[in-house]
């Protein structure tokens, strides 16, 4: 092998090794973020489960019949879908699974003769649905790395007012639940 070609190959090998090191560092950072997100989700799960149980008990007892968020809107012909994805990739099949679940729910709503309203959280869902030519009624970005309560309140306000006024027949969330 000529000296010039050998030098080129050595440079390429060094470049690949450098890229491998950078990729490994990115994997470690992503793994750390996943662990932190899992810890936050796990700490909120008991609270979420208990709140859900209390609401179900209130509904069964008939104590919540008049609450505007628990009554049916039979005249409404629109189902809202809140689709929660990440702002960036590097999260395995998370975004794809959430978007597929949302698309199945949208198809089911259309089969029932309902219109749909898309509320998306994260750039990935927004880009996907706009690429598909679907109207996105509300989009929230920059919340997925470090979500806080105020972010959830902002998203809920966008949906709540429409449900309370009778514009929406239902509201569904599309997300994945982590199982270890």
Language-model segments: which ranges?
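Conserved loop-to-helix interface motifs that mediate assembly, gating, or partner/ligand docking
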Residues: 1-180
């Amino acid at each position: 092998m000529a000296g010039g070609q050998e030098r080129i190959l050595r440079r390429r090998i060094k470049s690949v090794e450098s890229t491998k090191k950078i990729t490994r560092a990115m994997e470690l950072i992503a793994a750390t973020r996943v662990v932190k997100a899992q810890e936050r989700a796990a700490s909120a799960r008991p609270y979420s489960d208990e709140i859900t149980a209390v609401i179900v008990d209130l509904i069964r007892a008939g104590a919540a019949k008049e609450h505007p968020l628990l009554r049916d809107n039979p005249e409404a012909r629109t189902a809202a879908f809140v689709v929660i994805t990440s702002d960036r990739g590097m999260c395995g099949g998370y975004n794809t699974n959430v978007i597929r679940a949302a698309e199945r729910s949208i198809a089911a709503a259309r089969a029932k003769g309902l219109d749909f309203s898309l509320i998306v959280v994260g750039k990935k869902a927004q880009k996907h649905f706009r690429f598909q030519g679907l109207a996105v009624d509300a989009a929230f970005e920059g919340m997925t790395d470090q979500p806080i309560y105020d972010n959830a309140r902002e998203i809920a306000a966008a949906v709540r007012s429409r449900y309370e006024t009778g514009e929406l027949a239902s509201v569904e969330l599309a997300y994945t639940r982590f199982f270890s």
